[in-house]
């Protein structure tokens, strides 16, 4: 090999080394750029995932709030229905009792009639027993008589139809009950018709 050939070989070798170094630098730059791109891509992917997670959390919270509102509404509905049912049970007999009151009045009037005949007294005793039995059954279903005579006049329970002047009663006291008043639990079915002292 001649000196010239060796010089060409050395130049070629140097050139190859230089190209290898350049290639190595280029590869490093490409890897560095790729690595930076990967980091940026990973960072933006993480940001996207975090946004998606946050959005999903908000949706879950929103659905949970809707559920809690619906649950509260349902509980209120159940309570309202229970109260309405209880009220219906309490006052279910109101219409029937209101219709029976005139019959009770008629029985009371019949019992006030006096007679001397034994058959009349026997009949009256039977009517009295039926009357007491009927009142007992009605009282067991919540019917109560409104107390009137001697009580202070109360427009919630009494209906004044006459005035009286009686020194044995206080002013504004009921002196006489003309028609018995009744209430069902705490609801007045019919006020007592009364005479009130001045």
Swiss-Prot record:
Listed name of the protein: Protein GrpE
Start-end of Basic and acidic residues biased regions: 16-35, 46-58
GO annotation terms (biological process): protein folding
Statement: the UniProt record of this protein carries the keyword Lipid biosynthesis: no
Superkingdom of source: Bacteria
InterPro entries (alphabetical): GrpE, GrpE_coiled_coil, GrpE_head
Subunit structure, interactors included: Homodimer.
Stored PANTHER family: GRPE PROTEIN, GRPE PROTEIN HOMOLOG, MITOCHONDRIAL
GO cellular component term of the entry, any: cytoplasm
Single GO MF annotation: protein-folding chaperone binding
UniProt cross-references to Gene3D superfamilies, sorted A to Z: 3.90.20.20, Head domain of nucleotide exchange factor GrpE
């Amino acid at each position: 090999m001649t000196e010239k050939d060796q010089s060409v070989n050395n130049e070629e070798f140097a050139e190859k080394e230089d190209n290898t170094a350049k290639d190595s630098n280029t590869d490093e730059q490409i890897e560095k750029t790729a690595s930076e791109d990967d980091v940026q891509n990973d960072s933006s992917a993480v940001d996207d995932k975090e946004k998606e997670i946050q959005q999903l959390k908000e949706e879950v919270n929103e659905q949970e709030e809707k559920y809690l509102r619906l649950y509260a509404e349902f509980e209120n509905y159940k309570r309202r229905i229970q109260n309405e049912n209880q009220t219906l049970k309490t006052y279910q007999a109101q219409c029937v009792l209101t219709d029976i009151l005139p019959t009770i009045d008629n029985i009371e009037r019949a019992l006030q009639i006096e007679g001397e005949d034994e058959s009349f007294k026997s009949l009256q005793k039977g009517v009295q027993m039926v009357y007491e039995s009927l009142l007992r059954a009605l009282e067991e279903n919540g019917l109560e008589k409104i107390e009137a005579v001697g009580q202070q006049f109360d427009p919630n329970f009494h209906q004044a139809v006459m005035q009286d002047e009686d020194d044995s009663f206080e002013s504004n006291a009921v002196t006489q009950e003309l028609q018995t008043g009744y209430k069902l639990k705490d609801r007045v079915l019919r006020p007592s018709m009364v005479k009130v002292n001045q």
